[in-house]
């Protein structure tokens, strides 16, 4: 080994030892008769002292920041008053006798711990990863995966790998396709998840499976998504919903306790999908901001205000939420901004009032009685603001108000977004209508067990034995009890409009397995990238992935995706169309 110790290892107890350290030159300071180098590696930092009479002193003239060096020297206690309490090695320094330059660095585009634009950080990711922030995040990620593996091992789970080259079964996002050279015109697909394989493992008798696995989705990348991502994939046989939730809570609690020393209260809260939509306008609620949506129809019974009256006559709803102590921010200009945002979200407009010494609102002339009713019933206090909207589509109304609630919360109440709000969302509808495909699609996936009493021909009434875990408004995991009866699986395919021959073409190998003994089973998949980002306090998953893609799926470091050699395309019998 070139080194005897790391840069974060030496302590006062090592005083007098001859040591060799290797690392990057973080900083150089010249105080005349003595020169100091802060030497850094992933373990920490050590101060190197180069006295004027040493060979090491002369070598410093050749050094540049971020050069990689080997230092030989002796450990000594720092003089009293010069200790650095901010680093683990702050009580000692190494008096250098020799410095060997292993790799001299040219001037860098930026230096670790600087914060250039993200494009620059991604282009030179190997420099960015030297920063303390990124180093801590990557180490945290490793520690979390280590805890997860240990947890499942203790419970008797087996970590089993599943194929990356598999069959395309397009449901939901597009597959990444891989052409086969040996079978021209045929394609593999990279897995969007190991869903079918983990169910086949249950059918194979491996009753407790987990895997930390890469997954791939060729989708239009929304904010903070990646085309390749990592799941903690879990499946169990002979279980019900309570079993899966209990094991999942144990994993999350263990991760928080061992990774960041935080004890979580279990079991976690649970709310139904319906309750989440009614109170928060989303199935991924962040409850830390408060401001629950409220049904305000009672205040508008018999109203003469035409806009709301017409909505109510059509069977629509009136809802709103209270923003506490927001009156000083709620100017006419702010009201106009929120009005425009409400229209962007599909609402006809927005009504608002604030409580000061009296009620203030541009709508007061027409709605004073209604506002006073709301103030009394909802116990509004001076300084509170109430935002109100009406629409005949209750789902749209909930979602639009939920978005406004969250945007106001993040902009004005970020001080409330402390800690971790963890809950389960349960009792999902099985199907949702896809405007793009003009048909009902499975909200989770078509292998989810329905609540059998609800399984009929009316898509809107079918419930799923599905569950999502949400932390701070992000879906961190989702799963379900799976179908283990062939007739139910065929019924679901039929409700999805999938013909028998189409189902056989896509899932024949899977349906064949249903003939030969399928245990009741269920599972869950956690998004590791998102879980780590939340625990690290990062807003973007790119901050916890060593080599992420940009928002449009490009690797700025390598230039992927890129053109390939014409010979490779000919071997695959692929022709690229221009434009």
Swiss-Prot record:
The record marks 81 as: Important for tRNA non-discrimination. It holds the Pfam family tRNA-synt_2. Transmembrane segments: none annotated. It is found in: Cytoplasm. Residues 195-198 are annotated as: Aspartate. GO terms for molecular function: aspartate-tRNA ligase activity; aspartate-tRNA(Asn) ligase activity; ATP binding; nucleic acid binding. Its EC number is 6.1.1.23. It is an enzyme of class 6 (ligase). GO terms for cellular component: cytoplasm. GO terms for biological process: aspartyl-tRNA aminoacylation. L-aspartate binds at residues 171, 217, 444, 482. It catalyses: tRNA(Asx) + L-aspartate + ATP = L-aspartyl-tRNA(Asx) + AMP + diphosphate. PROSITE patterns: AA_TRNA_LIGASE_II. ATP binds at residues 217-219, 226, 475, 527-530. Keywords: Aminoacyl-tRNA synthetase, ATP-binding, Cytoplasm, Ligase, Nucleotide-binding, Protein biosynthesis. It comes from the Bacteria. Coiled coil: none annotated. Aspartyl-tRNA synthetase with relaxed tRNA specificity since it is able to aspartylate not only its cognate tRNA(Asp) but also tRNA(Asn). Reaction proceeds in two steps: L-aspartate is first activated by ATP to form Asp-AMP and then transferred to the acceptor end of tRNA(Asp/Asn). Homodimer. Belongs to the class-II aminoacyl-tRNA synthetase family. Type 1 subfamily. This is Aspartate--tRNA(Asp/Asn) ligase. It comes from Thermotoga neapolitana (strain ATCC 49049 / DSM 4359 / NBRC 107923 / NS-E).
